[in-house]
């Protein structure tokens, strides 16, 4: 189980990313439209002004049961360990155990 501080930090990053999403997108569109190098540098400086944690690359996908940041399946929102346990206890309908 991930510590609560890490989970809270991730939630804070998600809120910041949503808050600054439109600003970042509009600045990136401006950069692509501008041809002058000096103007691009000015816009790039503005793009660096929002907080670092508002960047979408800082977000991690976490298991919603345990908070584990690794081995997550997008379709389920679960980590591999929890997914395997749920399949073994027949809590996920339609999922079958592989055998070869």
UniProtKB/Swiss-Prot annotation:
Keywords annotated in UniProt: Chloroplast, Plastid, Ribonucleoprotein, Ribosomal protein, RNA-binding, rRNA-binding
Localization in the cell: Plastid, Chloroplast
Primary localization: plastid
GO biological process: translation
Keyword Aminoacyl-tRNA synthetase among UniProt keywords: no
Keyword Ribosomal protein assigned: yes
Cellular component aspect of the GO annotation: chloroplast; small ribosomal subunit
Family: Belongs to the universal ribosomal protein uS14 family.
The protein's assembly and partners: Part of the 30S ribosomal subunit.
Name this protein carries in UniProt: Small ribosomal subunit protein uS14c
Source organism of the structure: Fagopyrum esculentum subsp. ancestrale (Wild buckwheat)
Phylogenetic lineage: Eukaryota, Viridiplantae, Streptophyta, Embryophyta, Tracheophyta
């Amino acid at each position: 189980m991930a510590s609560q501080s890490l989970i809270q930090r991730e939630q804070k990053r998600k809120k910041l990313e949503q808050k600054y999403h439109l600003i970042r997108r509009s600045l990136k569109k401006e950069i692509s439209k501008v041809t002058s190098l000096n103007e691009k540098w000015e816009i790039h400086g503005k793009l660096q002004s929002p907080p670092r944690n508002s960047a979408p690359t800082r977000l991690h996908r976490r298991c919603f049961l345990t908070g584990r940041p690794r081995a997550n399946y997008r379709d389920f929102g679960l980590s591999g360990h929890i997914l395997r346990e749920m399949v073994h206890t027949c809590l996920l309908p339609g999922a079958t155990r592989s055998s070869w």
